[in-house]
Amino acid sequence: MRDAANLCWKLAAVLRGQAPDSLLDSYAAERKPHVTEVTRRAVLVGRIITERRPWLAAIRNHVVRALTRIPGANAVGQKFWWIPEAHYDDGFFAAAHPALGRQIPQPTVDGVPLDDLLGGRWTLMHTGAVPVGAAAWAAAGAATLQITEPSLVRWLADHKADAVVLRPDGFVYAAASSGGRLPAPPAGLNLTTLTGAPA
């Protein structure tokens, strides 16, 4: 799913003539490390599951049984073993900031899933006053959303941001701390029509 989400909006931008072909080069830079890590974890878990030496299999079975008795251990284990954090170290992003390349959490906002609220659009999300540089994003066609939902406010604070600009795939393209200026929108992209929806 993340592969499709990453590639869909980029292909749409290139096919609509809204972005250069070079935008597609960011796909491998962003996705390859994540896929490599998922594969590494799957191989490791596979080795644990298929262990045939009786003494190691007995230890494995004992540990797994013990862990299943701990409330919440299954959810934590799935995240630890299977699903690496959605974070890109390299790719199509603005100037450096701790929030860049991270996927925004997906809570429900006023009874609506955040994904549905964002609608696959470029979106400027902020917690307080409209940040410096927001006018350029609005002029380029990005939606603006002031957030008060506690988990989103906490997530932004944890990543030292009062405002973030989300790409259509829900990853942070740009961010600004309190009183900071948002970087300018990417040149040449028409953010009004550039969404994660099919062309």
Residue ranges of predicted features:
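Extended, hydrophobic alpha-helical segments in both membrane/secreted and soluble proteins
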Residues: 1-12, 23
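Helical substrate-recognition/capping region of FAD-dependent monooxygenase/halogenase enzymes
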Residues: 13-199
